[in-house]
Amino acid sequence: TGIIIKALSGFYYIDDGSAVYECRARGNFRKSGISPLVGDKAEFELSGGSGVVTAVLPRKNFLSRPPVANIEGFYSFFFENPAPNEYIIDRLTAIAVYHGIEPIIVFNKCDAGDFSRWESIYRAAGFRVFTVSAETGEGIDTLKSEFSGGISVLTGNSGVGKSSILNRIFGNTALKTGEVSEKLGRGRHTTRHTELLRLTGLSTILSNRASTINGRNRTGKQ
């Protein structure tokens, strides 16, 4: 038994705590209408150096985009240019709450903008809010301490600094980043795959763009 940490082209990479195994899924998953997802706890068998996923254990929650299951924290990232959009914040927090996931709001680059208005609005609504700077490191340690265990999803549009903050937390180059283009008003980095990045022995992170976040019925099949 292990956790699916990566899904790519029909292959599932399962971490059992000692090693990562490349596996295929059995055909009976298609008949049941259930597909293994990143974050799933799965049973698998090894034969001749390759693995087969034999069962997916019950999920506490899941999202269809990004395709990930068993999420503990849902972190939405925003920064000052363009200004935070209340509709997007509300949409993302609503998706998280509906699926039984705790939403956390993060405003990046606190040295370059004033987020007090949004902080007061969403803290008053009962949400946890953090203001950090990927450039100076301000607030990063406090945010890092929130990742106490389980799987966390980080979402936000390109250029908000998700990758830079991950690099600050990991202490190395976890993801490639690009400087924000002032002319285009957007960043050049785009997350291209669904994969969990290990933060500690108990905590893993998935980074995704806000525009691709979507939810499904909590009891629906995936």
Sequence positions of predicted segments:
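SH3/SH3-like beta-barrel fold
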Residues: 12-16, 23, 44
